[in-house]
From Swiss-Prot:
Fe cation 2 binds at residues 208-209, 241-242. Pathway: Protein modification; eIF5A hypusination. This is Deoxyhypusine hydroxylase. Its cofactor is Fe(2+). It is a peripheral membrane protein. Binds 2 Fe(2+) ions per subunit. The gene is nero. HAMAP family: Deoxyhypusine_hydroxylase. It comes from Drosophila melanogaster (Fruit fly).
Length: 302
């Protein structure tokens, strides 16, 4: 059992702007794994930080915790137009991940947001909550511990059939996401390469989710596609950030070289993402037991 004192100490690391960002990230993921009201409170305090990357990750973790106690802070962040688009988008996605019907009116309102990534995210989150309410069941063979923005497509479809839905801009983003998660769950080279084609889509939100999924898959065949979007300085920084973190998860020598080249990028979100991704590379290539090592570090300081 983790004590209140331990949670406060880990929250202290997360909220200490003097600590390296990679340490604060590890503290955040430790709090996510601990869960509960005290961890949510500690995470919520960091939304006044000046790092959009960190705040976006706070919202992501609150969504993955699937605890309705986080809905108030997430609603506040979504409504706050002084927050960066990637932070507001992640707050909306987190509300969809928690899936409580109380979020429907606020998501409906912000589905018309002038920031396209926020509006699109609210539309997908609405579809997810309504899908949950419908009581439909789907064989979700998600091999990852993530709460996804949509369930996979129902029924057994081939890669060709799924790819046709996935790349069809006339389909709703929710249905395209469903096809993407079905392709991900197949975990074949053919399905990974089909997913990688989505990095050319016209929607920045879609491209960023594609990069996230490629990071989950950790397949080296996707490296050239992720590299191309990361290196494109005209690409949306939310997408470049997600490409960097995906390369960090794949963690080959090539990935490390690419990330080192962009660790001093003039876009802060990209630069910080490369730093975090290099820390992830270090973890993936080390005998370390756990990335979210905040508790172990606390014990080591005793």
């Amino acid at each position: 059992m983790v004590s209140q004192q331990q949670i406060e100490a880990i929250g202290g690391v997360l909220n200490n702007k003097e600590r390296p960002l990679k340490e604060r990230f590890r503290a955040l993921f430790t709090l996510k794994n601990i869960g509960g009201g005290a961890a949510i409170e500690a995470i919520s305090k960091a939304f006044d930080d000046d790092s959009a990357l960190l705040k976006h990750e706070l919202a992501y973790c609150l969504g993955q915790m699937q605890d309705a106690q986080a809905l108030d802070i997430l609603t506040k962040v979504l409504k706050d137009t002084t927050q960066e688009p990637m932070v507001r988008h992640e707050a909306a996605e987190a509300m969809g991940a928690i899936g409580h019907p109380d979020v429907l009116p606020i998501l409906e309102e912000y589905k018309q947001d002038p920031v396209v990534e926020v509006a699109e995210t609210c539309a997908i989150a609405l579809d997810r909550v309504r899908w949950l309410q419908s009581g439909q069941k789907v064989d979700d063979s998600n091999p990852y511990a993530s709460v996804d923005p949509s369930p996979p497509t129902a029924g057994d479809k081939s890669v060709t059939e799924l790819k046709a839905i996935y790349l069809d801009a006339q389909q709703s983003l929710f249905d395209r996401y469903r096809a993407m998660f079905s392709l991900r769950n197949l975990r074949t080279e053919e399905s990974v390469l089909a997913i990688a084609e989505g990095l050319k889509d016209s929607s920045a939100l879609f491209r960023h989710e594609v990069a996230f999924v490629l990071g989950q898959l950790q397949e080296p065949c996707s490296i050239p596609f992720l590299q191309e979007n990361l290196e494109d300085r005209l690409e949306n920084e939310m997408v470049r950030h997600e490409c960097a973190e995906a390369l960090g998860a794949i963690a080959t020598e090539d990935c490390i070289q690419i990330l080192n080249r962009y660790a001093e990028d003039d876009k802060r979100v990209v630069k910080e993402s490369c730093v975090i991704a290099l820390d992830m590379c270090e973890y993936e290539n080390s005998p370390e037991f756990q990335y979210a090592d905040g508790l172990a570090k606390l014990d080591a300081t005793k």
